[in-house]
Amino acid sequence: MNQLTNFMNPVAKPETFDMIKIGIASPERIRSWSFGEIKKPETINYRTFKPERDGLFCARIFGPIKDYECLCGKYKRMKYKGIVCEKCGVEVTVTKVRRERMGHIELAAPVAHIWFLKSLPSRIGLLLDMQLKQLERVLYFEAYIVLEPGLTPLEKFQLLTEDELLDAQDEYGEDAFSAGIGAEAIRTLLENLDLEQERTDLMEELATTKSELKPKKIIKRLKVVESFIESGNRPEWMILEVVPVIPPELRPLVPLDGGRFATSDLNDLYRRVINRNNRLKRLMELRAPDIIVRNEKRMLQEAVDALFDNGRRGRTITGANKRPLKSLSDMLKGKQGRFRQNLLGKRVDYSGRSVIVTGPELKLHQCGLPKKMALELFKPFIYARLDAKGLSMTLKQAKKWVEKERKEVWDILDEVIREHPVLLNRAPTLHRLGIQAFEPVLIEGKAIQLHPLVCAAFNADFDGDQMAVHVPLSLEAQLEARVLMMSTNNILSPANGKPIIVPSQDMVLGLYYLSLEREGEPGEGMLLADMAEVHQALHIGAVTLHSKIISRVPQTDEKGNEYLKRFETTPGRMLIGECLPKSHTVPFDVVNRLLTKKEIGDVIDQVYRHTGQKETVLFADAIMALGFRHAFKAGISFGKDDMIIPASKEQLVDETRSLVKDFEQQYQDGLITQQEKYNKAIDAWSQCGDKVANAMMDEIRATPKLPDGRLAPINSIYMMAHSGARGSQAQMKQLAGMRGLMAKPSGEIIETPIISNFKEGLTVLEYFNSTHGARKGLADTALKTANSGYLTRRLVDVSQDCVVIEEDCGTTRGMEMRAIIQGGSTIASLGERILGRTTLEDVVDKDGNVIAPVGTLLDEATTQRIEEAEVQSVKIRSPLVCEATLGVCGKCYGRDLARGTPVNIGEAVGVIAAQSIGEPGTQLTMRTFHIGGAAQVNEQSNVEAISDGTIEYRDMATIVDQRGRRLALSRSGEIAIIDSEGRERASHKLPYGAQIMHKDGEKVKKGDRIAEWDPFTMPLITEKQGVVKYQDLIDGKTLTEQVDEATGIAQRVVIEYRAAGRSKKEDLQPRITLLDDASGEAARYLLAVGTMISVEDGQTVQAGDVLARVSREASKTRDITGGLPRVAELFEARIPKDNSVIAKISGRIEFVKDYKAKRKIAIVPEEGDPIEYLIPKSKVLEVQEGDMVKRGDALISGSPNPHDILDVMGVEALAEYLVAEIQEVYRLQGVKINDKHIEVIVRQMLQKVEITDGGDTTLLPGEQLDYLEMMEYNAKLPKNGKPAEGRPVLLGITKASLQTRSFVSAASFQETTRVLTEASVQGKVDSLQGLKENVIVGRLIPAGTGAAMNRVRVTASSKDAALRAAMRVANQEHLIAPRTAAEEHAAELAQGPEAAIGDDPLGKVQGEDFTTDDVMVEERPEGASEE
């Protein structure tokens, strides 16, 4: 019987294998799978509905149609099991075998497998060293190929047309050489390949080749040849002689009503193949003319191509309704393919969905489940319980009772549901908090009730959202749901470690209102003894919630004893104080202030850190109830009159109008350019808008005193916005201020602002202007969702196999963290960045005392101490430099953000990182900003001191000009501020030509301006004095007078000059030369295109004068990619559009020579060889001849190319750059993400190395492979062998996911056919280490609880082996112990099939009846269950 469908062991359980290998099937292998040859294209008999014999659904080949019944009906029932009916030839067995048994088609002529032919690079082409075009001509019978030239002058592999072939045969004789056509010819060539010989030839060629491009091609071929040798695949197997036919149940034929049939497309494709094959056989028997046979063979080839991959070559074969037929490849590919539809995303039973409504009276761990829904979901449990209680005799009766909904059923439902958590999920599930467990509470109605505090995690609102309910069935699942997924366990967000259970909207408003303190309220200044008195006073109206009172509040000391302490507070704040947990770590002070949404979040954070999870949950529930109650009691509402339009608006608008008129006039008079006018106008209007907004806020914020001495009630709109409940200052500005400037869809700003606000109403023109940008916004939102989802998918795919696998990898590398400071304000403090990380070195304060020893996990208290000691930088461990193989270690990762504890082994940190970065993706913008207008305002143009200290110049050459200003002349210089203890507080890079306010060593105060510069132009400053001489500056060729058409003012500008014709003399280099007194050349300055010259020819200049200006506008008007596209660009490691050029070494700049459109410059180091760069002339150089540059400095401005950073500066610098750039995009949107998530992803992008030196291994220079694989190769070397070396390569996330070591995971991501083709040629083995592969083969993932199970499995199998050895010694007399693996296998086979089941140590453990190891020994037959 066939090995695939051994009835005792039908399909290998996913637990029993550890690896999956993919290869190319040989014809023998295909025949051994098959249960018979399919000879006819018929499917079933349409009259009797019985399958045709030898057809595509033949019962004799594939198995019976009904269980244990042969086709003709001679044998029925179980007792004939295994008998083959002599009449119809059908074996009596279960129908299920029709899902497993395969057939085959013997082809009359060999056919090439389209995957190996057309999947680029073509494997057949690489092996034979032929082009795909030529191969196709041979395979599709258009040309002959010379197989053996014999003694003729023809060459092997030469293509001949039919006429050429006949001529050659006439000339040399028919037997002098042999030529072939079609797949047969290719097969002969592949059979005759000597792979070993080919390998040695290629190696020699590689060693001797001189050209640049050759090695790449040779390496490609060498790889294919080697993979064939190593995998044991034969090249001729890429040509098929036998086509396998998949089991009929997998390509079903279903009768529809009305006598029609619905069938799988595969049946059509198979029928085509069989028809053409049979016709070809007949033609060959009839000895038909060659041309007819050849045509039939070509058609057969095309039919098989269509079966395997329809549409890959030639016309797509379509069905009756012009729809392309789905081939085998299409079954796997894409979102609807096998991988993504059925293996990675399955539908589950025991689930339901319904609309959600709010459930404010629920506890945090509860959800309201409609009774009807619960009854349906928990049916099996109810049947079991009815049965156990003896209420129903049979299952049928139990069903009836449940359907009739008798009252006993409801009681039992209550019992069943108690303590049985359910999972709630809201699509789209963007992060792991999108599925959480709750305890169901039965409710009437048909809607699910959801606790208001978890809405933020689900991103749910109650405007008609739906949610799905799932029931965890097994005990383990219930346990995990309760211990790990319960909503009470998910208080902190895994993205940033801040609480995600934070009150919002009404609750915030209520708490804000409670914590308001107001002057002149009744009962102000009362002294109240304690909480009871406060309640009483409130009840009788002696005080209001906002009266200032003095009262005693119960506090807890460190020993846990209560005592009373006096506070100046308000009754409202005391009500909030009542909810606080009783602990000395959260004193009443935390709520004795005005609470906005942010502050409430901080309080919850503090409560969680100091008192733990249980107290936090109780506190959250309490303040939620309090918030709702008081939002309701406050009765806050607003009307039109609450939007107060400031009185000063008119005047401000008029002032700005006249200002803009002035700009218009200046433009007409030619004092400013069009662009400058636009910028100034937009500046003026945006400032006006801000002034109006500020005036409005002042008026709305104000609470004037009423005649009776009380304050006027606070403005409701202001309360809502200020508390963070709803609305923002920007929205208030539009309601009652001035709508402001609008953008066009292109992102440019329209020059005329909208002066009205919504209260006044817009004019028609204003309304039209505002719709322009609004529509763009709506269209963007739709695109954004899809883009963001795709980014998340790629991120998950690249990082899914990154799991914490050990405690400590023991690395000595790390990253240096310091505070991020931009434009004088701290964006991220040092404490924020190192919180929850592990130190790499001792952290010491200025006196040398250790604050945190090496290996400390920094918690809040320690980081606070570090910040107080004013430590400037801390070295920490990072997942980037973690040396753990196949994952990261706990120390490098640090704290698990969602729990606030050190990370557990088995935590899937990769997926968490991907979700944390992808989830806020929908909040990012899609725009690429065109700079222009208001965006220019934020261009930085000065540096201020962030603290007191002393100025220190570093590599900073300066010059003092005639006006006594000190100008920076160095391009890589820095200016640092050193504090009194000698520590560096800040260092700033200054642009060339910046004016520096202080001398080296001068003292500065905090907030002093250190330097400033013009952000829009870059000057060219002379360092010597002399006389200006123009060179190659010829009017009309390289120099032009540009006159602004509107103003008539002329400026001399250098233009690009292309020499006409081929005259070499005309190669002009526009430059200014300075002549000193002796008329010698003192200095020369090359001028880039677009430079405006500020001096005359022959003018005398002093040191420090400006010779010319380059407009930085030119280098700055490029689009800034913002938002989501920018994040994607960084993660894909794309080379940016205007990429800068980085100096690879430090040295002096020299200009070598000019070419037509490029210029060659060199960096000459102090020792070693110079490095040359070719730079387009259109680019503005940041350096001049003779400048000193440092390694990593930019030669041309622009966005740096991440690959360059990696090559020049190393892994840490690259990571720092990527983290900073990605964080900046998110920070602009106000999204907080912890750095370590980005580091995890960058780690996955840096897994590969490019071999620089193969050493004594078989690796070739230029090959790319995993760092681990390179180490494996090196480990195999003999003792004194020279190891291979490589340099890290940065791969984009898509590329990195496609190049994972697991082919199953890569195939399920993208380009399925290509991945599988490559894997099968190499005979790849997937060791199933990542998460995705395990999901696909259907076992527990090796993360979380699955990691523990994995460990158990390993120990169990080793124990098994030990037991077996012991048994073998005991049974020595029964069984002579086999010594080799082969003998052992033979002994196993001799025992019959029963022994070979139960390979899996956990397979024995089923349900309740656990058996211990020693009991198992007794039951097992000798030597059974070999692993």
From Swiss-Prot:
Cofactor(s) annotated in UniProt: Mg(2+); Zn(2+)
Sequence positions that bind Zn(2+) 2: C809, C882, C889, C892
Record: residues binding Mg(2+): D461, D463, D465
Entry GO terms, CC: DNA-directed RNA polymerase complex
Region (Disordered): 1394-1427
EC number: 2.7.7.6
GO biological process: DNA-templated transcription
Sites where the protein binds Zn(2+) 1: C70, C72, C85, C88
Catalysed reactions, semicolon-separated: RNA(n) + a ribonucleoside 5'-triphosphate = RNA(n+1) + diphosphate
Enzyme superclass (EC): transferase
GO molecular function: DNA binding; DNA-directed RNA polymerase activity; magnesium ion binding; zinc ion binding
UniProt remark on cofactor binding: Binds 1 Mg(2+) ion per subunit. Binds 2 Zn(2+) ions per subunit.
Alphabetically ordered keywords of this record: DNA-directed RNA polymerase, Magnesium, Metal-binding, Nucleotidyltransferase, Transcription, Transferase, Zinc
Basic and acidic residues composition-biased segments: 1417-1427
HAMAP family linked: RNApol_bact_RpoC
Assembly: The RNAP catalytic core consists of 2 alpha, 1 beta, 1 beta' and 1 omega subunit. When a sigma factor is associated with the core the holoenzyme is formed, which can initiate transcription.
Known role: DNA-dependent RNA polymerase catalyzes the transcription of DNA into RNA using the four ribonucleoside triphosphates as substrates.
Family listed: Belongs to the RNA polymerase beta' chain family.
PANTHER family: DNA-DIRECTED RNA POLYMERASE (PTHR19376), DNA-DIRECTED RNA POLYMERASE SUBUNIT BETA (PTHR19376:SF54)
Protein name: DNA-directed RNA polymerase subunit beta'
Gene that encodes it: rpoC
